Structure formats: C-alpha cells, structure tokens
C-alpha cells in the first residue's frame, strides 16, 4: 500500500495549472487552423500587419458565461443569439483550441516517458498498423481461448470531464469546457445517442478523437494496473504508453477500500499468459488457461464500464471462443489458428511406433467478400465482383487515371502483403486493372478489345506488378530461391499509419 500511495502522489505532482491561459494565446489557433481553414475568418486589419485576432474568442467566452441556459432549448439552437449564423464556424474555433491546449500536457508526458525508455527511434514503427501482426504471430499460436470485445460507447462527456480533472488541476478550463459543450448542443442528446455523437465527431473531429482516446486510455490504464498487480509477469513494454491512474482515489478511505474490497477480487486474475490487443473500437483478450478465467475477465470489463464509466455494455458483445475453432476479424484480416498434424515414425531398438506432432500456425486471410463489397460501393465492380468502368474519372488524363488506380492497387498490396494466401489479393488487383482499362476505353469511346489492340496490352499498365517484386528483384537475382521464398512469405510494412478506405473491418 505504500507503493500505491507513493505512485498516487507522484501522478498528482505531474498535473499542470496552465491550460486556461493558453486558450488566449494566438499561436494556438494559428497552429490549429493554418492548414484547415481560410485564415480570413480570423484576420483583422491592424495597421499593416495581419494577425490572428483573439477578440472573437474573448467575446464568445464572455457570451457563454452570460448565457441563460434555462431559456434556450435544443430546438432553438439555430436561433441562438450567441452563435448566430456563424455557429458552426465559431464552435469549431473553440473546439479546436480546446483540443490543442488539452493535448499539450499529455504529449509532454508521452515524450518524457519515451525518452526515459529510450525508444524514440522505434516509436514511429510502433505506431504502424502492421506492428501488431508480428506480435500476434509470436504469441497467439500458444493460446487456446480468445475473447473479441467491442468497446462500448457513447460515454457521457461529464464523466470524461471529471476524469480529466484528476490529470490537470485547472478549474476555469473545465468550466469553460462544460459551457462550450452545453452551447454546442443539447448536453444529454448528443452524448447518449449514436447519431448525435456521430454529428459531434464530424464537426469537431480533433476534440472528439481526444475525448474518445482518453476514455480508452483511462480504462486501459485501470486494466493494466490490475493485470500488473495480479500477474507474475509485468507488462514492461506497455508501461510507457499507458499511465496507471489510481481510480480509487475518488473514494474515501483509499487504503481501506483497496485492502478490504479489492484484495479478494484480484485473486481471480492471476494469469501470467494473458494478452490484450486493441484496434479501432474493438479489443482482443487471449489466454492459454481455461475459459473460466476468461469469463472472470469478461465480468470484470462489464462491471468496470458500468460501475466506473456508467456506460452499458451488453454481454453478447464479448464472445469467448476456442482459438483453434474460431476466426475473427482484425484490421481488415481474417485471423485463425490452423493446426497442422504430422506423423513421425520412430524406432527404439527393435520396436517401431508412430508419433503425432501438432504444429500451430497463425493464418491471416484476405477477406475477399468484404473487399469486393467495398469495391462495388466505390463503383469499381458490381456486387458479383465483375469489373466496371469508373465514368466519373473519365474527364481526367490517361496518366491521372492510371495513377489513381495504381495508388489504390499499391496501397492494398502493401496492406495485405502479410496474407497467408495471395490468391484473393491477386483477384482484387485483377478487378482494379480491368476497371482501369474499361475506364480508359470509356474515355476514348472505344471497346476494351479495340483499345488494348490500339495501345498495346503488354506495355499498358505494366506497373500493376507488385512493387515488392520490383524492389526485391533489385536485391536478389530473379532465379534466387531467397526471392521466391520472400514472395511467398509475409512482408509487414512499419510505415503504414492509416488503413485504406476500402479496408472494411465491420
């Protein structure tokens, strides 16, 4: 318990009291809007020099404090004298300023943690989407059970504001944040319904992403704290990214609560071989032990979300399955563990007997049906996977049309190059190649056969060969066995920070 109290005091000492004054700094809004909005919105003519005016921000904040919230309803939002006709623009001004300011202490904390761990150089690689798959290849083949969990949302933003107060001691800033959220829309409606929170996320993407990521980081910090305290093996590799917040500080008599109410519960969670992976709005929990322990963790997550974050989590969104008999989706891939059985004949003296050997291998398969559905939605093919032309691109030059198709094909090839079976990937590339040819033929008002005969089918679109083969052919001879082996094996790219729009994980 001494260690618990020391860490709590150390976490509180890191809190800063400087956020509210930063809202009135001009460079904050210049940083937020230099690339996204027209600067004329914020410029005022002051002599010969033009600078970002903070009069708009100060006037908005003053009116927010003078507003009578009991008179205005959600239906009168369009007639709100505070927002007027510039409601959307000025609400984005404040929200972007909030997002920039509130990210500063967390970014400084992350930078100091990375410097202490001396992993600054590898931090960019750790951000890659593909960095998760080598980890799964090494770990998941040893596990027996997996739980695919959907992170519940939306969460009431007042809960997030209260949690933020444990990180940063700045009462005026949080009062202003509450006022802004109230003026933006009806507080209860856009927080408790998916349609309203979707509207909020589109109009205020930076602030919404920060609040959502903070919510995820908060529950993960609690999860990792319990896991580290209850396990024989510590998760040293993850300590640098998730600060453990001691959430029982909200209760009185901290020592008594931890000693009495929680010491017995921790005995259910002792498992040195349990792994947690989060991606987008889902997470995966894998374990080698019996499903009894997985059920314990399932109930733990449900009570954590309901008791601490006051968000409802339905039990059916957390499924526990045997890994060898179940496949699940992860970042656009289908994952399952294939068991290979082999028989070895052994002989000892004059006795001969057979030995069965079972070898597990992680399979990552390209989901061909969701990809074809995404291609059909983007008008590259029909629902059956037959390529069609893209008439909306016919006004572009031939070079631009080919370049667009090549970029899509190259991005998909890079993203799915870690697949165990490349046949589905080749089909996707065939659809894009033929769709490109049909688009060019449509532009030149010709048939596909006549267009290929006139332009030459061998020279046209030769860049549709994978970029990996061209690069590897420069390193190894074309008849090299190493090149053949690399083409069959998986290649992960540690520079992929975003998934392609065609990658559908639903």
Curated annotation (Swiss-Prot):
Gene Ontology CC: chloroplast
An annotated Gene Ontology molecular function: RNA binding
UniProt entry tagged with the keyword Plastid: yes
GO biological process: mRNA processing; RNA splicing; tRNA processing
Entries under PANTHER family matching the protein: MATURASE K
Similarity annotation: Belongs to the intron maturase 2 family. MatK subfamily.
Descriptive protein name: Maturase K
Organism: Medicago truncatula (Barrel medic)
């Amino acid at each position: 318990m001494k260690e618990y109290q020391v860490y709590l005091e150390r976490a509180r000492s890191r809190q800063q009291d400087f956020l509210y004054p930063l809202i009135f700094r001009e460079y904050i809004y210049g940083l937020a809007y230099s690339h996204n909005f027209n600067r004329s919105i914020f410029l005022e003519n002051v002599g010969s020099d033009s600078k970002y005016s903070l009069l708009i921000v100060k006037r908005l904040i003053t009116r927010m404090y003078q507003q009578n919230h009991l008179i205005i309803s959600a239906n009168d939002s369009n007639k709100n004298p505070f927002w007027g006709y510039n409601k959307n623009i000025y609400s984005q001004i404040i929200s972007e300023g909030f997002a920039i300011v509130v990210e500063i202490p967390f970014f400084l904390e992350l930078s100091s943690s990375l410097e202490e761990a001396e992993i600054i150089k590898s931090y960019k690689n750790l951000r890659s989407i593909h960095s998760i798959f080598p980890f799964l290849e090494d770990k998941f083949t040893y596990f027996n059970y997996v739980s695919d969990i959907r992170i519940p949302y939306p969460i009431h933003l007042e809960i997030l504001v209260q949690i933020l107060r444990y990180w940063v001691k700045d009462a005026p800033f949080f009062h202003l944040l509450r006022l802004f959220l109230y003026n933006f829309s009806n507080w209860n409606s856009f927080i408790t319904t998916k349609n309203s929170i979707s509207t909020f996320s589109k109009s205020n993407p930076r602030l919404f992403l920060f609040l959502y990521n903070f919510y995820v980081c908060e529950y993960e910090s609690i999860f990792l704290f319990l896991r580290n305290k209850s396990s024989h093996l510590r998760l040293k590799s993850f300590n640098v990214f998730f600060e453990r917040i001691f959430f029982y500080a909200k209760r009185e008599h901290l020592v008594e609560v931890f000693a009495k109410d929680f010491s017995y519960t921790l005995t259910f969670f002792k498992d040195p071989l349990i792994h947690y992976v989060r991606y987008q709005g889902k997470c995966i929990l894998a374990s080698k032990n019996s499903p009894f322990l997985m059920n314990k963790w399932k109930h733990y997550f449900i009570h954590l979300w309901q008791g601490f974050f006051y968000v409802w989590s339905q039990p059916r969104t957390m499924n526990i399955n045997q890994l060898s008999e179940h496949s699940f989706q992860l970042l656009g891939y289908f994952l399952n563990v294939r068991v290979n059985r082999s028989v070895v004949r052994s002989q000892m003296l004059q006795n001969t007997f057979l030995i069965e050997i079972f070898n597990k291998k992680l399979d990552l398969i390209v989901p061909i049906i969701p990809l074809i559905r995404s291609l059909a939605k983007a008008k590259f093919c029909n629902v059956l996977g037959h390529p069609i032309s893209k008439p909306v691109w016919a006004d572009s030059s031939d070079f631009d049309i080919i370049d667009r198709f090549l970029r899509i094909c190259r991005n998909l090839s890079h993203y799915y190059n870690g697949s165990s079976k490349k046949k589905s990937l080749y089909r996707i590339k065939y659809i894009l190649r033929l769709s490109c040819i049909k688009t060019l033929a449509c532009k030149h008002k010709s048939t596909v056969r006549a267009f290929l005969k006139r332009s030459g089918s061998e020279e046209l679109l030769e860049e549709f060969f994978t970029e990996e083969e061209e690069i590897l052919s420069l390193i190894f001879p074309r008849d090299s066995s190493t090149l053949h082996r690399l083409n069959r094996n998986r290649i992960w790219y540690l520079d992929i920070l975003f998934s392609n729009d065609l990658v559908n994980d639903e």
